[in-house]
Amino acid sequence: MLSAVAIFGCGDNSSPNEGLTHSSEATEIEEKGGVNVITSTIISDPANDPYSVDNMSKAMRKQILAKSGVDSQEVEQLTLKPNYLYIRFLANGKQGLSELKAYDTSLVLFKHPLDYRPIRKPAVYIDPLLPDSIIPLFATVPVDYKFGPTKYEVLKELFLVEPLDGNCDDEDDCPDEADSTTAVNYLAKSAAEKSSETVIKKLSDMGVSLRDVEWESLSMTGNLDDRFVSQTLKPGESPVLGWSLFGSGKKLGGQLKFVDDELGVQPLVGVRVTGGYSYYWREAHTDKDGKFRIPEKWTFKIDFEANFDSDDFLLEDGHSWYGEDLEIEHNNFKSDWNETFTGDKAKWCVVWTAAYQYWYGDNFGLKRPRRNTWYNWSLDIEVYYKNKKDYKNLLPTSGPFIGCGAGESSGQYKSFAGLEEMCISTYGNSSRQIYSTTIHEIGHTSHYWNTSESLSDFFDLPYGFRNTYTRGLEYIFQKNRYGSVNLSYIKDYTGIIPDLMDDDSRTADGKKNIDRVKGFSMVDIEKAIFATKSLNEMKKYIKNNYPSGKSGRSYTHTDLDKLFDYWLNI
């Protein structure tokens, strides 16, 4: 563990490099329930870090000496200066996390430490010395980065060579000789310092690129195997050496899809995809076709990760003690990531698709659910996909509680310790049921945030009133996505909403031929529900505000009374 760190905030006048310390201890990594539990900010031995300033400087000197053939005292004095900082941000709760993301939307933030070696997933980071109110997040930033109000710690000074950007066209591969313009530009910017000017001159004079330096450092520290696939040589073949193994820089992306068991293959829309390795990461989001493109061009193999998170909600593993975020990895590739997810991962995608549509997609003009602001934080949606018992029960364990305590339902929205809790069970359920259930439960949080002062006020509303609204949401969303509706209607989950909308004289449960009401829009109905606190109040609101004969509506007060009486007395 670090024996001391420098903590900074916006008002701190200290240099961000003051108080910097390094640890020579590798972290102890525990495995609990298949989860990689990391307890230190520094994971692998810093002495073997290929991106440390010391090792990159040693590698640079070795390359210059190898090409000059002269053991120059002048060369031995050459030293690189850090161009990146490895940072731990200390966000003050979800409000602080929102503040950090709003300050710099380009930051690629991780909930676990970064390392020069691959990290086994799923991983969680636990620092018992931090108060529960603090959310630690890890990132790398340029050395001259202008920090915002979020407190932070400098964990390491680094010299990073990627990306290959300025010398390359967006669509074409970079030439083999292309150097990292980001790193070169940094050296040039600091060339006013005599040491930096000398470094640039020596590198230029000897024809040494920063890519050569990085190769040397990776080789010198024993990390080359993590960056390229070993060569398979035929008899008589000579091995390819140096940067030729990597070839040219390449822009990487791909297309992500999933299988809906009723609709077939569907695009995975809006998911955040990170791509990179070690300390250098970039991110993109999948478009309407599930396609994405990671910024910049890469000479090494990179790791991809699809993250089911957004500013307003995220999916987490309901079975885990640690509640780690759901994510899908595709590691160690220098090619596009094109994959169609099946099984449990496809079910995660269905939950995500429903939530993403309600928050950001076509929601038919309805009010959006809760948004992530300083007073309203993102919603964690617990997904239970391995078994039914963890969802059904609330199980005390040696650690925190796991389970939802949701009984035989498929989804649950409740107040837990004064906060919202949402659980979705995908185990044994069809894509349609998962999609519909997710819409139903998100509808509850939308109802709450658009109408109520507190969770207790919301849950004081009649149970049947709340679930009539969310059953109606299932009706319209399900009909739009699947072209048909497969729902049941009972006393607390009434069919009033489809009966107000359709022109079928039968009630939504098919039992009575009394429905003479038609033509209402879901937007009209939602306004009536959000303005009232019971089904009877909703009926009065409709009579007073939505006259028959306008906007396609057709009904008499008697017909409306008869329809509501049926569902209230079923």
Residue ranges and their predicted role:
Residues D457-M501:
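Post-HExxH zinc-binding segment in Zn-dependent metallohydrolases
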Residues C349-E420, I424-Y427:
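Auxiliary, metal-adjacent structural segments of Zn-dependent hydrolase domains
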Residues S44, V53-S57, D71-Q77, Y493-I570:
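Pan-zinc metallopeptidase signature
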Residues S3-K32:
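Bacterial Sec-dependent N-terminal signal peptides
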Residues G275-I294:
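Short, acidic Ser/Thr/Gly-rich low-complexity loop/linker segments typical of extracellular
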Residues S436-E453, N467-R471, Y475:
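Active-site recognition of the HExxH zinc-binding catalytic motif
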Residues Q63, K251-Y279:
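Short, ordered, surface-exposed loop/turn motifs in non-cytosolic proteins
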Residues M422-T438, L461:
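Short pre-active-site segment immediately N-terminal to the catalytic Zn-binding motif
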